[in-house]
């Protein structure tokens, strides 16, 4: 336990070790550690940002979806209305067409009736003459009686 | 071993391998007389004492420098391969030490000085490594040294006050340097003269108190570390004197206890160094 030159030797060794540590050991390792800390911090903040972005995107997507839904509903509504209109118009058309057809048919029937009546009228004179001949057993002068017959036919 | 009685055994284990200068006409242990002043290894504890200041504890210096080189070599090795990515096992260990020391400095030191943290790291790891040597059974290395012809051999540098005072004096010089640098000569003198009693009448008393407090710092640093390590060493030596079959019941618990003491003493020395230097940086 003697105090001697070892004391000075130890002090010198201590100084050299401290100097070496300050110069060659401390800086590279702390630099690497700080760089890693920064990397981790950056990564974390990036993750935060990403999650925020995701939230925004989700919100936007929900909005878009909502908008699309609304648009689709409007379209369907419109289409339904249009379809109803078309159906209505078709119905109207069909009805008009039907009426027209019926009208036509009626006219034709009327025409035929007139024609038949005229034909009948024409024949009635002959038939009446024939009938009268039979009854009278004589020939009737057609020319003499035609006036009367025509009057008769007109009464039919 | 060159020890027949317990007292000799203990004395032997507490004597350093000393290389020093014997004065002219000195009568050595074997009766021979030194013709002129010579540098030689001390053969007995008495010779080592008589060498006075002009002597070197080869074992203390050798082992402490070896531990310092081990520390710096290991850390420099890692520093060369350091990666910002996922650290490997060894880098992890080194970084844990760094973070530990950075934590101490951050908590205790309030100034800004790039020297403090590496200084604390050096002190902590170096003392830790020197203290750890204590866990090597006390007779292993001295026996080998003895076989190589070296009479005395102490492997734990921190059980030698020269080693602990060497460090604490280094710290003391730094305290003085930064006190003068930060506070200036007048500021530092004022601090010594007007604390704790701020009155001119108290200046002599203040000076006495403050200078004493200043000088006590390195002494307490060195003696605390030395005392703890030395006492532990003595207990190990005493245990080694017991019969072989009973030794393990005592030296195993004592060694386990030293697993606590070894880093604790390194930690205390480091923290106090940072505290003292922090005070040196505080300008009132």
Swiss-Prot record, chain A:
GO MF, any single term: proton-transporting ATPase activity, rotational mechanism
Stretches that traverse the bilayer: 12-32
Key words of the record: ATP synthesis, Cell inner membrane, Cell membrane, CF(0), Hydrogen ion transport, Ion transport, Membrane, Transmembrane, Transmembrane helix, Transport
Major localization class: membrane
Cellular component, GO annotation: plasma membrane; proton-transporting ATP synthase complex
InterPro entries: ATP_synth_B-like_membr_sf, ATP_synth_b/b'su_bac/chlpt, ATP_synth_F0_bsu_bac, ATP_synthase_B_chain
Subcellular location(s) of the protein: Cell inner membrane
Topology versus the membrane: Single-pass membrane protein
Family named by the database record: Belongs to the ATPase B chain family.
NCBIfam families, per the entry: ATP_synt_b, PRK05759.1-2, PRK05759.1-4
Purpose of the protein: F(1)F(0) ATP synthase produces ATP from ADP in the presence of a proton or sodium gradient. F-type ATPases consist of two structural domains, F(1) containing the extramembraneous catalytic core and F(0) containing the membrane proton channel, linked together by a central stalk and a peripheral stalk. During catalysis, ATP synthesis in the catalytic domain of F(1) is coupled via a rotary mechanism of the central stalk subunits to proton translocation.
Assembly with partners or alone: F-type ATPases have 2 components, F(1) - the catalytic core - and F(0) - the membrane proton channel. F(1) has five subunits: alpha(3), beta(3), gamma(1), delta(1), epsilon(1). F(0) has three main subunits: a(1), b(2) and c(10-14). The alpha and beta chains form an alternating ring which encloses part of the gamma chain. F(1) is attached to F(0) by a central stalk formed by the gamma and epsilon chains, while a peripheral stalk is formed by the delta and b chains.
Protein name as annotated: ATP synthase subunit b
Protein's organism: Marinobacter nauticus (strain ATCC 700491 / DSM 11845 / VT8)
This protein's encoding gene: atpF
Curated annotation (Swiss-Prot), chain B:
SUPFAM superfamilies per UniProt: F1F0 ATP synthase subunit A (SSF81336)
Bilayer topology: Multi-pass membrane protein
Keywords: ATP synthesis, Cell inner membrane, Cell membrane, CF(0), Hydrogen ion transport, Ion transport, Membrane, Transmembrane, Transmembrane helix, Transport
Transmembrane segments: 55-75, 116-136, 165-185, 196-216, 234-254, 255-275
Main location as per UniProt: membrane
Compartments, record wording: Cell inner membrane
Superkingdom to which the source organism belongs: Bacteria
GO-annotated molecular function: proton-transporting ATP synthase activity, rotational mechanism
GO cellular component, one term: proton-transporting ATP synthase complex
CDD domains reported in the protein's UniProt record: ATP-synt_Fo_a_6 (cd00310)
GO biological process: proton motive force-driven plasma membrane ATP synthesis
InterPro entries the record matches: ATP_syn_F0_a_bact/chloroplast, ATP_synth_F0_asu, ATP_synth_F0_asu_AS, F0_ATP_A_sf
UniProt keyword Cell inner membrane, yes or no: yes
Pfam families, sorted: ATP-synt_A
The protein's assembly and partners: F-type ATPases have 2 components, CF(1) - the catalytic core - and CF(0) - the membrane proton channel. CF(1) has five subunits: alpha(3), beta(3), gamma(1), delta(1), epsilon(1). CF(0) has three main subunits: a(1), b(2) and c(9-12). The alpha and beta chains form an alternating ring which encloses part of the gamma chain. CF(1) is attached to CF(0) by a central stalk formed by the gamma and epsilon chains, while a peripheral stalk is formed by the delta and b chains.
Free-text function comment from the UniProt entry: Key component of the proton channel; it plays a direct role in the translocation of protons across the membrane.
Similarity comment: family membership: Belongs to the ATPase A chain family.
Protein name: ATP synthase subunit a
Annotated gene: atpB
